[in-house]
């Protein structure tokens, strides 16, 4: 996994993101990469993915993917979860539903595959 204590990434997370890109960047098929990356949006690792894929968190200006209150304390906004798509995916809608059923909000994507 891409778990990293400080959420800023390190050499290991960069290599993991490079590996993800190696699997998808030359792929001519519709591609969606989704996950709890545990990395801040400005991290080098996320920036690597941004160069080759469309980051929907960034495109839709999402500020948080997690509840801001944990154990009664305000922990502030945090983006840890991402959806990346390639140019074979048409996004009809994307939202982060602020529903506290988990320690992460659900990411909801409505899309079509482009022929």
Where are these regions (language model features)?
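Active-site regions of metal-assisted phosphoester/phosphodiester hydrolases
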Residues: 1-115
């Amino acid at each position: 996994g891409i778990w990293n204590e400080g959420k800023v990434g390190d050499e290991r997370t960069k290599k993991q993101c490079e590996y993800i890109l190696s699997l998808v960047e030359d792929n001519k098929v519709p591609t969606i990469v989704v996950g709890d990356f545990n990395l801040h949006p400005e991290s080098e690792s996320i920036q690597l993915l941004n160069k080759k894929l469309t980051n929907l968190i960034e495109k839709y200006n999402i500020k948080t993917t997690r509840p801001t209150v944990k154990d009664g304390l305000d922990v502030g906004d945090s983006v840890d979860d991402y959806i990346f798509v390639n140019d074979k995916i048409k996004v009809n809608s994307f939202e982060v539903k602020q529903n506290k059923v988990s320690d992460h909000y659900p990411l909801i994507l409505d899309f079509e595959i482009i022929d």
